[in-house]
Amino acid sequence: MGSDDLSAGDKIQKGFQINYMILRDADTGKVIWQENKDFSAPDVEHEARVPVKILDMRAVSREINFSTIESMENFRLDQKVLFKGRIMEEWFFEMGFVGANTTNTWQSTIEAAPESQMMPAKVLNGNVTIQTSFYDNEILITKSVVRLYYI
């Protein structure tokens, strides 16, 4: 199968890689979690062990560093937070144009749910997955699932 046989999404995915991800306290800028792992691989459920104190933060700043061989007209992602398979929250992020053969850093802020909607870490631990779908406009590039453990 040559590169002409790949769909547009497959072609982008083949040259797409997450280099690292960092979570920071949005108020202080202090790093609370960092992982040098490609969380974009679609065929495996990834795991992330994050400090339990993340649940007490007003907002978290997420930094994704990624590389791409193909250009993207409108790089965006949709994220669903699921508890035991049921959607608790859904977020939409848009970065826009990404040049070919580049490495990029994308930072966005995620605000916590109201305290009245928060569950204790012992209930959430291992039962929360974050499903992230990466797109170029409406073309699905890849979908990844990360299971969260609070330490």
UniProtKB/Swiss-Prot annotation:
The keyword Lipid biosynthesis does not apply. Keywords: cGMP, Cytoplasm, Nucleus. The keyword Nucleus applies. It holds the Pfam family GMP_PDE_delta. GO terms for biological process: sensory perception of light stimulus. Its main location: nucleus. One of its GO terms (cellular component) is nucleus. It is found in: Nucleus; Cytoplasm. Belongs to the PDE6D/unc-119 family. Interacts with Pde6. This is Probable cGMP 3',5'-cyclic phosphodiesterase subunit delta. It comes from Drosophila mojavensis (Fruit fly). The gene is PrBP.
